[in-house]
Amino acid sequence: MGVASIGKIMWLLGIIAWYAIRYPFERRARRSRVVSNRRSRSDFAGLASALFGMAVLPAFYVASGIPESADYPARLWAVILGAIIFGTALWLFRVSHKMLGRNWSITLEIREQHRLVSSGPYALVRHPMYTSFFLMAVGQAFLLSNWAVGLGGLIGFALLFFLRVDKEERMMLENFGPEYRDYMERTKRLIPYIY
C-alpha cells in the first residue's frame, strides 16, 4: 500500500469519525424549539460550498482518483502531519459540540433557553467549531496529495466562514447584547490571539 492510499484511508476514517460525532447532536437539535431563525440563501450557499469542498470533491477523488492531473507525489511526513491536524480538528469539533450542547444548530438559529457559551475552547475563540473545520480543511490538503482537492477544502471552508460569521455574530449581539459584546472584546474569531 502506497503513501497516497494511506492518506486516502486516513481522510475517509476522519470523515466517518466526523459524522459519528455530529450525528447525535443533529438528532438532538431537531427536538429543540427554535426561537429565532436567520436562515438565508447565503447561509445555504456557505454550507453547500463546505459540503462540496470538504466532502463531495474529496470523496469523489478518493473513490475515482479524478482529477488525476492535479496529483502530486504523496509524502509520508505530509500524511502524518495531515492525520495529526485532522485528529486535532476532530477533538476540537467534539469538545465544541459538547460545550454547545442543545444550543447548536446547523443553520443560524437561536434555541429556546439559549445561553452564551464562553468556557472551554470558547474562552479562546468565538467560533471553535469553525476552527475545527479550518483544521479539517488543512488536514485534508496534507492527507490527499491533489492540488484541486486540497484547495477545494480550503475554499469550501473559507466560503462557509465568510458567508456566515458576520451574520452569526450580529444574531448573537441581538440576542445577548452587552454580554456578547464583552465576549467579542476578549476573544478572537477563529485563531487564538491572532484572528
Residue ranges and their predicted role:
Residues 1-112, 118, 136-195:
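Membrane-anchoring alpha-helices and their flanking helix-loop junctions
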Residues 119, 123-131:
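Histidine-centered phosphotransfer motif of kinases
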